[in-house]
Amino acid sequence: MKVIFVASGNKAVGTVSAFVRSQYESLQREGVDMTLFPVCGHGWKAYAKAWVRLRRLVRAQHPDIVHAHYSVCGVLAAAATCCNRTKVMVSILGSFPRPSFKLRWVRFFIRHVWDATIVKSQRTADQLGIDLPVIANGVNLDQFALVDYHTARQRCGFEEGKKYVIWCSHPSRSEKRYPLAQKAVALLDDPNVVLYPVYDKPHSEVVEYMCAADVLLLTSVCEGSPNVIKEAMACNCPVVTTDVGDVTWVTGGLAGTWVVPYGDADALQQAIRNALLFGKRTQGRERILTLGLTTQQVAQKIKAIYDTL
């Protein structure tokens, strides 16, 4: 089976998101003949150029499936394969918190254009109003291996006597709501609690921070299935998160995890306070295994859909 993997390459020239790369590699390990196609640049000109390149690649390789990540890449994949029999599968990675034009056209493509569509959370499927397979992104447990808490703190340069709340994204990304994280931590009024943003780090270093942190905080306004929550759980790190995507299902009421309404800084600070009082590691890694959210378990689910097309 030949599959072309299409995804945004705007992280850097020719570089896709870490979770896309991880899924690509896990499908290769399942025996799928994979080709990665990054879409570089922004705007219609970039996608027009990508359409020419993708169409040429499809004609040269004759793949069985073009699997696109994100709805816009799904439109690109459909346009590039419209004159042949290649199947198009799309992973919808975000969510639709309110009715919009985008919601309407995504529904149209799911029903009339794409051959298969998967979403990352049941919430997204409910927002679309369509019965769709829900397959969240997985975590590579070999990559996110456990590191001793005290060893990790030393490697990260964390100060003795301080509690660290890590927040894993670039503060400039408005949808991630870093100011809300700042406000919640400020409400604790404790100089020994440090809000520590982690960004532009390789996975090998992110693992260290998650194993060293006292709490992982997520304050996004919307997500599909945030990988950072699953990665933190794989490191047995306590989690405080806004109620986005599938976090309620993933955390499942596990001791050491708190899900609070979006935008409520008081509720966030209380949850952070509770997490710090919890004061130990969670059983998050065990729950990831139970839910079937390792990269290989997820790859097997995706391959099963490939086999039906």
Where are these regions (language model features)?
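Short His-centered aromatic/hydrophobic patch
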Residues: 68-74, 92
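Acidic anion/phosphate-binding donor-loop and adjacent secondary structure
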Residues: 139-155, 309
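Short alpha-helical donor nucleotide-sugar binding micro-motif in glycosyltransferases
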Residues: 208-213
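Aromatic "clamp/platform" in nucleotide-sugar-dependent glycosyltransferases that forms part
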Residues: 221
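Short hydrophobic beta-strand element within catalytic cores of glycosyltransferases
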Residues: 238-241
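Conserved acidic donor-binding segment of nucleotide-sugar-dependent glycosyltransferases
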Residues: 253-265, 273-279
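A charged, aromatic-enriched C-terminal amphipathic alpha-helix characteristic of glycosyltransferases
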Residues: 279-308
